[in-house]
């Protein structure tokens, strides 16, 4: 006679084993109809699963985060059902849940087309309309092998082979289609109505480019049509803001097949890049950082000492010269330790903050490359702080403040922070971990900042803080990192002379604010839709004459603004002024200065914004002062 305790503390007793669905029905028919699954003693189970002993139970509905994830997972299975009906020779691989949706990897003799994607979606809708029950059967291993052998599902058999300890597995039946999964899944297809297939892409079996290529069908699913419509609207807005399209339209950069994952910066884009670099250089100098430059190609021996060769070799570009193995650096930290090691340091010299705009290269899979957001060649705003254990908290607090100030200058105020603590496998004593975790937590607390605790998610060599910023579409981008490291200074023999004259290893704080210039610029492009604040805009003002008679004065204005440190240019083409205004508005230039005969006579400029606001005529010096104020605000105001 199980007694079921519900979240409100109420209890229900039954004289026999009872399913989650039956408990829901005993509460009410409406709840029973909305039941997706259950959480029994904290563990997610299917609605059909029996509860035989006393237990706590939470009924999971589409309104719960877990319910939405289950809906998405079941939609992936529905993709399998539709694909097997339309393309019987296709072989199904895996179909997991991802952020905002799901995908299914499929092996098929030809590439799927957009027409195929539409056909699969239509068949899924037809299957949903049949309103059939999804049947779960816990099946012995040998029978699972028989089922997938009879269906020629080679990849499912390989997955079973990779789970030698599993003697029974969950099979979920969508009518004639069967898939293997730990579950749980929806009890009926009526929960899957609010979905949409979104795109196709390539993938590799087990994510390894050496393996056979597969096709990936992506989709999204939501609890109701309203949520789906809102998501589709966000996606359409994101597509409008795609940094690749805007980058091409504004002449910022391009990529091409001959240099996959590498960026060709154009004059406008390189100007933007340099503005970021000069800003970060100034900020770091003001906060006690010393800028250095280290080699890009380094002998294998250093990477072996640091541990990167053993753990990261597949992601490193390597070469040989004179019988020696080299790697192009994927990160800067081992080289920064070499700078620290030149000359024995005293505790009086700590903390030592070494910064580098370090060019790094990583051999990312070609399928993962994405514009300038995911590249093989990139530059980090990288720095390493070498300090004593007693200095960890103060250095962490200073970095947190610096990072939030930088994000605010770029217009990002909504920042999420995560503190990741010790994993099971780690180096260093528990006492050292206690101090390190306490230092990071205290630094966050002293700043009055809320944060999510991620137990066990730290690196084996130290805890870390992650900084994620939220853009105008509500998307979250993880950019900044503060990582404490007890291990690398020991591996690379970094030492300092302590106050008692003994030699000790410093604590090393790996830190970055932007992450990489390339990715951060991509985020900025999408956040601002290319309409950068005046301080970032590659061209801050364009001066346009109405006729040739005003050309000389236009050039004078350009020179005056340039001498004041502004990025201004003249457009003296023999085009109608309306045409010029439209063109530079589309190029997102913040300020458009029009000069006609009256402006020449009065020695003024007629000022318009890219948004179409008419600011009137003003002397050049007054506009320069106005522009200087706009630049000084940086991104801390949305409108200027």
UniProtKB/Swiss-Prot annotation:
It holds the Pfam family HGTP_anticodon. Keywords: Aminoacyl-tRNA synthetase, ATP-binding, Cytoplasm, Ligase, Metal-binding, Nucleotide-binding, Protein biosynthesis, RNA-binding, tRNA-binding, Zinc. The keyword Repeat does not apply. It comes from the Bacteria. GO terms for molecular function: ATP binding; metal ion binding; threonine-tRNA ligase activity; tRNA binding. GO terms for biological process: threonyl-tRNA aminoacylation. Its cofactor is Zn(2+). Its main location: cytoplasm. It catalyses: tRNA(Thr) + L-threonine + ATP = L-threonyl-tRNA(Thr) + AMP + diphosphate + H(+). Residues 1-61 form the TGS domain. GO terms for cellular component: cytosol. Gene3D superfamilies: 3.10.20.30, 3.30.54.20, Anticodon-binding domain, Bira Bifunctional Protein, Domain 2, Threonyl-trna Synthetase, Chain A, domain 2. SMART domains: tRNA_SAD. Zn(2+) binds at residues 333, 384, 510. Residues 242-533 are annotated as: Catalytic. It is found in: Cytoplasm. InterPro entries: aa-tRNA-synt_IIb, aa-tRNA-synth_II, aa-tRNA-synth_II/BPL/LPL, Anticodon-bd, Anticodon-bd_dom_sf, Beta-grasp_dom_sf, TGS, TGS-like. Binds 1 zinc ion per subunit. Its EC number is 6.1.1.3. Catalyzes the attachment of threonine to tRNA(Thr) in a two-step reaction: L-threonine is first activated by ATP to form Thr-AMP and then transferred to the acceptor end of tRNA(Thr). Also edits incorrectly charged L-seryl-tRNA(Thr). NCBIfam families: thrS. Belongs to the class-II aminoacyl-tRNA synthetase family. Homodimer. This is Threonine--tRNA ligase. It comes from Pseudomonas syringae pv. tomato (strain ATCC BAA-871 / DC3000). The lineage of its organism: Bacteria, Pseudomonadati, Pseudomonadota, Gammaproteobacteria, Pseudomonadales. The gene is thrS.
